[in-house]
Amino acid sequence: MQAACWYVLFLLQPTVYLVTCANLTNGGKSELLKSGSSKSTLKHIWTESSKDLSISRLLSQTFRGKENDTDLDLRYDTPEPYSEQDLWDWLRNSTDLQEPRPRAKRRPIVKTGKFKKMFGWGDFHSNIKTVKLNLLITGKIVDHGNGTFSVYFRHNSTGQGNVSVSLVPPTKIVEFDLAQQTVIDAKDSKSFNCRIEYEKVDKATKNTLCNYDPSKTCYQEQTQSHVSWLCSKPFKVICIYISFYSTDYKLVQKVCPDYNYHSDTPYFPSG
């Protein structure tokens, strides 16, 4: 009698038969439904095991279909970097004291909207002129877009004097003591992750007209130096520290970029 009943249900409601068989196989706890549509029948006989199976299958299909979309959302094009020669050529054009030439058109470092640059304070320029020394320092920052950035400096001087250009934490004290200028406190080392990547100094001598008396000839020394720094996370703020010493002039200067310009979190100096 039970088999006949199942046979009638198969003819009248094949959907109910299939779901009910699955239910009996899993636990045998289902009962025959006396009335109601196939939609309400599915609602009542949907067991926990069937629910888990269907939901897991649905989730697997959903995530499997969106794997490529996630990769595409996270991927960005690699920025077009400057070559080393392009950077030094640009700095040479900027530091040419004899015949200033217009700055060549530069290629964009990154494609707009691909990722946020860490720094946006651009180029650095410092010009110092005294009776015995003419000094021009230019710098450029290049954001690589991968959590690191490089800072390039070039200095061109004519005359006698000592010049030092370096990167320091914002807590660095401005002082004339040469012995303490290169010391970085231990508490700053965690937020200052920069190192010298390249350094070169070229010197030459020549006789030119004296600045204080054009009728006389003076012995002058010409110096050109190149230095590049590579910085990476973690870091907070970096500052440019310039120390200049000559027989008639001394200067120590610390220049910090506008950190609020390139960061969502304002920087509040301390110490």
Swiss-Prot record:
Q: Where is this region: IV (linker domain)?
A: 177-185
May I have one GO cellular component term? GABA-ergic synapse
Chain positions covered by the region annotation V (Cys-rich): 186-271
Q: Which UniProt keywords apply?
A: Glycoprotein, Secreted, Signal
Q: Which Pfam families match?
A: Neurexophilin
Glycan attachment residues as annotated in the record: N23, N68, N93, N146, N156, N162
- The name under which this protein is listed is Neurexophilin-1
Organism of this sequence: Homo sapiens
